[in-house]
A protein has these predicted regions:
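Active-site-proximal alpha-helix that buttresses catalytic centers in soluble enzyme cores
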Residues: 1-310
Length: 310
């Protein structure tokens, strides 16, 4: 089970090492290498880490941070339902690495690799494929590999998202506008044929249909843009600042692309975007937490795995 990654600790050095690995990947930033690496090393890695320390400390919790903690908890639950089948975790960037995961299952003949990204994007699932290929090249093992590209229409996944919305008190006692906020990607990547935006739209539409929501009760936005280039729109933060002027004062935000809560959901959505919405005149902002290590999520993962075990 593979997630994106996280610094080893909420300190400047750990954040810098993580960002260097993450932002050096051409899958993440597709600019001429000489230009981008100069910007990265001379500017970004000097300026960004000190600014991110407080943000990471805000969401960190226990020693391993939310992504690693929750991913490991999810893996433990999945493992409890398939005794005899080793379930290990890896991160595309940071620790535990893909190579470390392969070492843990070195005696296996067949491996199911499940990136925890329901919607395929070259910058996420594609990067997992790259990391896997590199780890396999450096491994002495020979494995049959089953790779799960995406599961954005999986019925259990759609139902689990809908149930998480239905459990919200704000949804049960009101008529909030439901906002599906997905991590954005540069528009240029989408224009080059990345299926990600269409898969995001499909997931959101399926959940809205499952909830019997008319089109004027939900919307889709994209968050976490980085740098000056145009990313997928509409932007979540800009939308939050504009909704109260459109007469929408009650929103319920869910982030279907994030399998577990992390900096981008806890700090960016639950705190920053809430502040933007309320400052603009909004009255109630509710964040629906990620599926995390819930049993609903566990059963989705188990069903995906079982299809590959047959």
């Amino acid at each position: 089970m593979v997630n994106l990654g996280t610094p080893d600790a909420p300190d400047e050095g750990s954040i810098r090492r993580y960002l260097k690995q993450f932002l050096s990947d051409p899958r993440v930033v597709n600019l001429p290498r000489w230009l981008w690496l100069s910007i990265l090393n001379l500017i970004i890695l000097r300026v960004r880490p000190p600014k991110l320390v407080a943000k990471y400390k805000l969401v960190w919790g226990t020693k391993d941070g939310p992504i690693r903690n929750i991913t490991n908890a999810l893996a433990k639950r999945v493992s409890s339902l398939i005794p005899g089948v080793p379930v290990v975790t890896a991160m595309t960037y940071g620790n535990p690495s893909m190579s470390n995961a392969l070492r843990q299952v070195s005696d296996a003949e067949r491996i199911i690799v499940l990136p925890l990204f329901p919607q395929y994007a070259g910058a996420t699932t594609g990067a997992v494929q790259d990391a896997l290929e590199q780890a396999l090249a450096n491994s002495t093992g020979r494995y049959m590999i089953d790779f799960v590209d995406e599961y954005h229409t999986h019925p259990g996944y759609i139902d689990a998202l809908a149930v998480s919305v239905e459990k919200s008190k704000a949804y049960r006692d009101g008529t909030p506008r439901l906002v599906f906020s997905f991590h954005g990607i540069p528009k240029a990547q989408a224009d080059s044929g990345d299926p990600y935006p269409l898969q995001c739209q499909t997931t959101a539409s399926l959940v809205a249909t499952r909830l019997n929501l008319p089109k004027d009760r939900w919307m889709l936005t994209f968050q976490s843009r980085f740098g000056p280039a145009e990313w997928l729109t509409p932007y979540t933060d800009i939308t939050m600042g504009a909704l109260p002027d459109q007469g929408i004062h009650d929103v319920l935000v869910v982030c279907p692309g994030f399998s577990v809560d992390c900096l981008e959901t806890i700090e960016e959505i639950k705190i920053l975007n809430r502040d933007i919405f309320l400052a603009a005149g909004g009255e109630r902002f509710t964040y629906v937490k990620a599926l995390n290590a819930s049993w609903d999520h566990t059963n989705v993962i188990l069903d995906i795995i079982n299809k590959y075990q047959k």
